[in-house]
Structure formats: structure tokens, C-alpha cells
Curated annotation (Swiss-Prot):
InterPro entries for the chain: NADH_UbQ_OxRdtase_chain4L/K (IPR001133), NUOK/Mnh_C1-like (IPR039428)
EC code: 7.1.1.-
Membrane topology, from the record: Multi-pass membrane protein
Protein name (record): NADH-quinone oxidoreductase subunit K
Keyword NAD: yes
Enzyme class, UniProt record, top EC level: translocase
Transmembrane residue ranges: 4-24, 31-51, 67-87
Coiled-coil annotated residue ranges, if any: none
Locations listed in the record: Cell membrane
Source species of the chain: Bacillus cereus (strain AH187)
Keyword line: Cell membrane, Membrane, NAD, Quinone, Translocase, Transmembrane, Transmembrane helix, Transport
Length: 104
């Protein structure tokens, strides 16, 4: 059984991170921006797992840290969606351009 080289994992992680970064910087829908940020976090998790599995000293530290990162990402998504729902109820829009003013 052949093993997948580390460069394939790292290339995939770079591609995922770049797609997420491009989406987070160019899209105007807040839900899409949150999804793109989650995609970037998943690319980082892929790097953590790849380096912990295929590094010079393989151990499970990167995999455990990746699990903690997924838990934090789930909490971040829940809080982000709750804030988005509250903003939508007040402004009736989910576009980033229209959420830049503060009420005083």
C-alpha cells in the first residue's frame, strides 16, 4: 500500500487556504465570509494533521490540537451565526457593505 506524500497534503492545504482567503476578501455576503473563514481553518487543520503524521517525529500532538481547533471553530461558527441573525433582525440584510455603521 503506497503512502500519499506530504507535498500532496500541503498543496491541498495551500489551495484550500487560498480559496478561503479569496472568498473572505471578495464576497459581500456575511454567511459566505463565515464559510470561507471555516475553510481556512480546515486548511490549517489539514496542515497540523499532515505534519503530526508525516513529520520528522510523528506523534499525535498535532492531531489532538486539530481536534481542539475544530471545537473552537464550531463555537466560532455558532457565535458568528448568532451575531448574524441579530444583525439581520435589526438591518434586514446580510451584506457586509451595509453593516459598517454604528448606532450612537
Amino acid at each position: 500500500m503506497s503512502s500519499v506524500p506530504a507535498s500532496a497534503y500541503l498543496t491541498l492545504a495551500i489551495i484550500l487556504f487560498c480559496i478561503g482567503l479569496f472568498g473572505a476578501l471578495t464576497k459581500r455576503n456575511t454567511v459566505i465570509v463565515l464559510v470561507c473563514i471555516e475553510l481556512m481553518l480546515n486548511a490549517v487543520n489539514l496542515n497540523l494533521v499532515a505534519f503530526s503524521k508525516l513529520g520528522l517525529f510523528p506523534n499525535v500532538t498535532g492531531q489532538i490540537f486539530s481536534l481542539f481547533t475544530m471545537a473552537v471553530a464550531a463555537a466560532e461558527a455558532a457565535v458568528g451565526l448568532a451575531i448574524l441573525i441579530a444583525l439581520y433582525r435589526n438591518r434586514t440584510t446580510v451584506h457586509v457593505d451595509e453593516m459598517d455603521t454604528l448606532k450612537g
